[in-house]
């Protein structure tokens, strides 16, 4: 083996080992600091105590984070996938493609705190939605839209062209081909990208602080109510100082575990969908 190829191989192994070690150390350290706090009561009770969050649990924050994330996924994934379909299978004008791609790139570069400020000024105040899950979810949806669109567009480009051409050759319309051939074939990768985008939204603090997350709230019953969120709760615990540090580490571990579990489920689902499609 040439020395350059050998060096590249060793560098790849070293990088993989370093990244794995950092992730394991991060999870291990956070779990070690918060292990005494994590319990069934911590996961299922509401926060309490003279200093809010010092006692009790984080159940409303868990439910709130899931509500924020799920709503953002619905609002962000539909236009993202529609844009990707248009870019790959409908749009033939290079200038329009370049314009759309530039807009998507510009959106991806907007800081999350700016999106939060926009949602606060336009949705919370001008449209009088108030601080609620829907206001935050719109900001989060805008934030994750470029991520999902780019991943979906890449997935559509990797689809074997003969699959689409065969459908057209049989006289199938473009809409029929998209709905019955393309989307089922790419379902696994699309769902995986959507879930990963949701994980990105779950950890975003700035948009939630401005628009819908509050220090304390019960489990929300509608999208027009404010809610607790794990990033916001963690921020408040850290701001309170050393008395709440154990609870803060417990909250951080739960949030990291939810994100890791979502990533694993997305990966497993994508692989199983690919196998089923190849078999069929």
Q: Where do the protein language model's features map onto the residues?
A:
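Glycine/proline-centered hinge or cleavage motifs at structural transition points of membrane proteins
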Residues: 111, 170-171, 184
């Amino acid at each position: 083996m040439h020395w350059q190829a050998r060096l590249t191989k060793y560098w790849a192994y070293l990088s993989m080992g370093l990244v794995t070690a950092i992730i394991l150390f991060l999870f291990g350290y956070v779990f070690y600091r918060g292990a005494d706090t994590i319990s069934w009561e911590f996961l299922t009770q509401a926060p309490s105590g003279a200093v809010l969050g010092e006692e009790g649990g984080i159940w409303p924050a868990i439910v709130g984070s899931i509500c924020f994330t799920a709503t953002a996924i619905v609002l962000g994934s539909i236009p993202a996938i529609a844009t990707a379909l248009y870019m790959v299978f409908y749009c033939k004008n290079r200038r329009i493609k370049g314009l759309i791609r530039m807009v998507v790139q510009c959106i991806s570069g907007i800081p999350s705190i700016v999106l939060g400020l926009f949602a606060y000024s336009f949705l919370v105040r001008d449209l009088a939605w108030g601080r609620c899950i829907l206001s935050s979810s719109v900001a989060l949806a805008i934030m994750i839209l470029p991520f999902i669109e780019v991943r979906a567009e890449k997935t559509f480009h990797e689809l074997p062209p003969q699959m689409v051409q065969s459908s057209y050759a049989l006289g199938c319309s473009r809409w029929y081909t998209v709905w019955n051939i393309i989307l089922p074939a790419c379902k696994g990768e699309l769902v995986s990208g959507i879930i990963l985008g949701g994980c990105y939204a779950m950890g975003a603090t700035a948009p939630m602080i401005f628009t819908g997350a509050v220090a304390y709230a019960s489990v929300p019953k509608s999208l027009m109510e404010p809610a607790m969120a794990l990033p916001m709760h963690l921020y408040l615990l850290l701001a309170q100082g050393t008395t709440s540090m154990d609870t803060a580490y417990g909250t951080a571990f739960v949030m990291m575990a939810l994100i890791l579990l979502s990533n694993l489920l997305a990966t497993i689902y994508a692989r199983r969908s690919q196998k089923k499609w190849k078999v069929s």
